[in-house]
Amino acid sequence: CGRRRGSLAWPDASSPSANPRPGAGAAESSACTTSGWSRWRTSLLVAGALLGLQWLPQLAGLWVACFGFGTGACIILALMFMGLRTENPRQAAALSGMAQCVGYLLAAFGPPLVGGLRDRSQDWNPALTVCLVLSLTMAAAGMLAGRNRRIRSASTAASTPAAG
């Protein structure tokens, strides 16, 4: 696989390396072969945008654009990893349902909580700091989710003898 696949936003996101699934398509190959840096740099873009809003608010347009690109890329990668890291469609559906439940709960309660924090402190810095910590947590989760591993079902794990 000597070809490089990428996009305008992340031209090196699909560095060539061994793909765990033979015959994988471009998107699957890209997600499976991204380097450690590529997997979590979208979350770092979000973190950088939040830091920029705190330190250089006069460039808010730039930081909001970076935040939008970063969060958009994060959701695409999250959805892609759910399908790529599971063994079958049923497992992918279960993982997707769990992740979307948590995601929608955060989407429902996060903005009012952050808004309440902003109202209570009369400053955006504490709210932006909370979001920064969450984006760094998301970067760590992205590193774990992007590892070249599969989520094994309980029945597969039980039928496979333990190594060692």
From Swiss-Prot:
**GO CC, any one term:** plasma membrane
What top-level branch of life does the organism fall under?
Bacteria
SUPFAM superfamilies (UniProt xref): MFS general substrate transporter
The topology of this chain with respect to the membrane is: Multi-pass membrane protein
- Membrane spanning stretches: 62-82, 97-117, 126-146
Q: What keywords appear on the UniProt entry? A: Cell membrane, Membrane, Transmembrane, Transmembrane helix, Transport
Could you tell me where this protein is found in the cell?
Cell membrane
- Ranges for the region named Disordered are 1-30
Task: State the function annotated in the UniProt record.
Answer: May be involved in uptake of anionic 4-hydroxy-benzoate.
Q: Which family does it belong to?
A: Belongs to the major facilitator superfamily. Cyanate porter (TC 2.A.1.17) family.
- Put simply, this protein is called Putative anionic 4-hydroxy-benzoate permease
Species the sequence originates in: Thauera aromatica
